[in-house]
Structures are given as structure tokens and as C-alpha cells.
Amino acid sequence: MITRFTSNSSGTGSPQPLRRRLLFGVASSAALAACGGGSDAAAPSPAPSPAPTPPPPPPPSSVWAAVDAAVDKAAPSFGNGLTVEVAIPAGVVYSRSSGGYTSQTRNPIASATKWVTGSTILRLVQQGTLTLATRTGDLLVDRNGAPWSGPIGQITLSDLLSFTSGLEGDVDEATATSITLAEAVLRIHDSQSKPGVLAPPKARYWYGATHLRVAGRMAEVATGKSWQQIFDAALRVPLGWDSASIYSLGGPNPALDGGDGGIRCSGEEYMRFLVMLLRKGLYGGARLISENLIATQRADAFTANTVIVKSPYQKFTPDPMYHYGLCNFRECGNPGNAGACDVDPTLRFSSPGALGFGPWIDVYGNYAACVMTRQPQQGNTEPSEVLKQTLAPLIRSALTSNPAVIRPLP
């Protein structure tokens, strides 16, 4: 039985009240437990320190500052304005315009057309309609209806796309816009089948329109369609180009090489084409050209004995002596050595136009870029070439900061 004690008024030796003694015991036990005295329980671990916050990416203005400065400095050399765009496989990461020219401006692109024409024909090779070994004599006939024969009938599609077919680069009679492509190619045959005119395949490189007119006519015969219909199905529609993007104002003798201005298109459309090539033939989830064909397109088409008769780079001092693939130049430090060029870290593929429109793909930089413009004077390509050389290392440097995509491409 618990007896309850109460204190008396004298404060003499009365026992401590039970409640006070119980509270004291509980408090003492709690204090000992808190101090760990006599306990096997481990003390709680301190909370881990938060991971350091990574620094934010630099703002776009600082990422592209050097590129902006180079474009702005060059702008006065472009009488009709210019736009420069850069794309990685995911899409466009840089765009800068001046002088009223934008990436939506639709203009003729001159010899930048050659790359598109060659890729259109490679699309037919991809589909099995043609092969790179298909010969002129397999598809073309002369004015008497007989297949092309003799050396001129042995020219392959690959020879034509590399401008090493042995044909002269230009035949004036074939350039009239009022005739058909079929008639133009008959005139080429009339001219080039004469004794002593044709060179052996791979003996010479002659930059010009003749090769692509013949290749385009082979495509028309193989498909039974006009060139514009071939281009529409092969690339224009898959790349989402506008129906206004046509060859030579839609005439019956399209300038497949870029003469008469070549294709009229916007820079934004051309960037889609470049990104397709950068992705090695993929666009919009579809395989337009195989990786093997893209590799063939980029490979050096010259032999050790190929002589450069005519090239747009001959007007530069020094002449870089760039070699050619299938409708694109191979820009590198040692173009005469195909193996060294292939592994050159500065290797670029390009197809510059006489109006200054200058597209290129930097293989090891993994980007595509284009100087978009229409110079007032045809042949004024130097400002675009100089700007390309200036921008190439600056773009690579900017891309190390992983800039954001500003215009995604499918």
C-alpha cells in the first residue's frame, strides 16, 4: 500500500513526497539516456551536405559573341545583306542576319544547287532506280535513236557526278532555257562525240554544267518523269520545302548545276538539306540516302592522274587544289592525299555558289553551316569564302558550350 506523505510546518525529517522523488528519477534517467551513459544505441548520423549546384550555362550572347563579331565585321562586304546559320543534328543553334536578308529570303543559290542535284540522283540510287555504275549507253540514245556507243557510251553515273566523265564542262548550245533537257543532252552528244573531244574517264576534272545535264537526263529516262517531278519526290517534299522551290524558274531545261541561278529556295530550307546530310541521310525519321552512299558522296573521286582543268577555286591565291566527291568539294589541308584528307580534323564538305551562297559541313566538328546571301555581282564569292574560313574554328569553340537548339528539325 502506498502511503501519501505531506510536508508539515516545522520542515523536520519528514520523508520526501512520493511525486517529487518519481519526477527526479525520471528526469535523471532521461539525462543519462541523452548522454549515452550505459546505452548501446549509436548517435544519429548528421545529415549529408547537399551536392554543389553546377554553374549555369553561359548565356547565348556570350557563347556566340566571337561568331557574332565576325559576322558583323564581314557584313559590309555583302551588298544585299546576309544570314549565317549553324546546325547540329538536332537542329539550328545559331542564326544571325543583317542588311534585310533572312533565312526565309528565297533566292537563286547558283552552284550550291550541285549538292542538291547530286543528292537527288543518289536518292534514285538508294531506291534502286539507278546505280553508280549505270552507263550513258544503257539509257541514252542519239538523234538516230541508237544507244550512245563508243567511249561516250561508257561514261558511268559516278563519273558524271564527280565531273570526271571526260566531257567538257560546258557546251554552250545546251544551255538555252527554251529547249528541253532531252534536246540539251542531244546537243551535248553532238558536240562531245566528235573525235578528239572526249577524254578518258578520271583523266580530267572539269567543273561545269554538262555532266549534270547528262546525269539528269538519265534520271528522267530511268523514271519516265520530268526532273522537277523527280526532285519533288526525292527531296523537296520529304524535306518540307515549299512548292516555289524550283529549278531555273521551272523551265524545260533545268540548270542542274546552278547556271541561270539554279534552285530558288530559302536558306531555312537549305539548312534542312544540310542537316539530312549531317545525319548521314536521315530526316524526319526516314532514311532518304544510305550511310554507305553518303560515304561514297564524300569520298575523293580523283585518281593520282586526274588533272584539274577548271575549278571555281582557281581564282584564289594560292589555289587550294581541292578535290571533289560526288557533287561536293573536299576542303582540307592536304587535298592531294585522300587518306590524309579523310582524317584531317579540319575536313569540310562544301558546294559554294557564284552568288555567294556558301553551305558547308564540318565532319569532325559535327555541324553544318551556311552563309546565305545573293551578291549583286555574280562571281563575287570571296567574301563568303573568307567568312567561312574565319567562322569555322569559332563555331567549333562555341559548340563546346552545348548551346540550345533554337529551331528543332525532325
Protein language model regions, located:
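N-terminal secretory signal peptides
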Residues: 1-18, 24-34
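Bacterial lipoprotein signal-peptidase II cleavage site
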Residues: 36-44
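A short, well-structured edge-of-sheet supersecondary motif
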Residues: 71-103, 240, 358-362, 367-372
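Catalytic-site signature segments of enzymes, centered on catalytic residues
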Residues: 106, 171-271
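Active-site helix/loop module of the DD-peptidase/beta-lactamase fold
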Residues: 108-112, 124-168, 217, 221-260, ...
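Active-site-proximal alpha-helical segments within enzyme catalytic domains
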Residues: 160-163, 211-218, 259-283, 294, ...
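Active-site Gly/Thr loop motif
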Residues: 243-261, 265-268, 299-370
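Short, gly/Ser/Thr-rich active-site loops of penicillin-recognizing serine hydrolases
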Residues: 378-410
